[in-house]
Amino acid sequence: MLFRSEYARKSIASIPPELRVMVTAHDAFGYYSRAYGIEVKSAQGITTESEPGVNDINKLVDFLVARKIPAIFIESSVSSDNIEALIEGAASKGQKVKVGGELFSDAMGAKGTYEGTYVGMIDHNTTVIALALGGEVPVGGMDGRLAGKTHALSGKK
């Protein structure tokens, strides 16, 4: 088993450089960006109490289209309304963008689950991000404990 930091760095590094950007509803992944070398863009700032304006959404849509980003991410603790607006906006400009999966940001997974631990949360987030953005990672995650949970994202049988 790779240590989680090494697994995360190698997994994120396997994403094509031009696609190495994580787009989420709000800016809760600054730590992840710094630790593992992925750019983070969000519709909202750090707080979820204010809504982004139309101009904010349009700028992010333009970014998605210009960079040809294939996937953006919903968060377990944040409404997906802004993500849906980004997907629709990109589609109106001819860019297909999908939901790459759900990430754990301000809250870990359910208590008593692997994703409910810090290691499980990092493993889950890293595996989901890498699979959605074209990286090379085991579908079951760092040590196979995500088997069957991230399978649909991989496109593999």
What residue ranges belong to the model's regions?
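Extracytoplasmic metal-acquisition and chelation regions
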Residues: M1-K157
